């Protein structure tokens, strides 16, 4: 159900897809779909939770904090540059090759222009969120190495921009 709904959201946009359309695509009735999910928003929330869960797993596997700095500042002070590189590679493969991640990203890209909520989510997941995360990691790495970075924000932009560009080109 989630994969089918997300595929439809990625092609037509979240707002344009009805529960009836999802049920029709699956060959089931709306009533059968409502036995699993309360509504379309519930389906979206389950998709988002799954995407977040996978992000936590990739973070742990790569040795980087799985939450924001405000939630676990101590974890940011122990990250190695290699761990950040490994994480970014894993992120690129995930966001460019995984069917769920690709469709989630495509849906957010479409919906960011139609809804302030989706625009904020797009920023958090794909633009300002990763940028702030990388900036915080770079700041903590420089503290540990006792080196002052001229502009952690500018360095984070330089680090993240190729990732974002290549991700956009992968479509």
What are the residue ranges of the model-derived segments?
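Helix-turn-helix
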Residues: 4, 8-50
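Hydrophobic/aromatic-rich alpha-helical bundle segments in the mid-to-C-terminal region
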Residues: 120-124, 128, 142-171
């Amino acid at each position: 159900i989630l994969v089918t709904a997300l595929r439809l959201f990625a092609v037509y946009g979240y707002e344009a897809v009805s529960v009836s359309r999802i049920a029709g695509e699956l060959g089931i009735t709306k009533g059968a779909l409502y036995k699993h999910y309360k509504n379309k928003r519930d389906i979206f929330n389950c998709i988002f939770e799954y995407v977040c869960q996978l992000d936590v797993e990739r973070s742990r596997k790569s040795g980087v904090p799985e939450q924001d700095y405000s939630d676990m500042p101590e974890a940011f002070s122990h990250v190695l540059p290699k761990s950040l590189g490994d994480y970014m590679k894993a992120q690129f493969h995930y966001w460019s090759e995984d069917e769920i991640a690709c469709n989630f990203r495509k849906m957010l890209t479409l919906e960011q222009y139609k809804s302030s909520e989706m625009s904020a989510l797009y920023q958090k997941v794909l633009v300002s969120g990763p940028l702030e995360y990388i900036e915080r990691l770079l700041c903590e790495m420089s503290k540990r190495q006792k080196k002052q970075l001229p502009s952690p924000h500018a360095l984070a932009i330089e680090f993240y921009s190729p990732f974002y560009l290549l991700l956009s080109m992968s479509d």
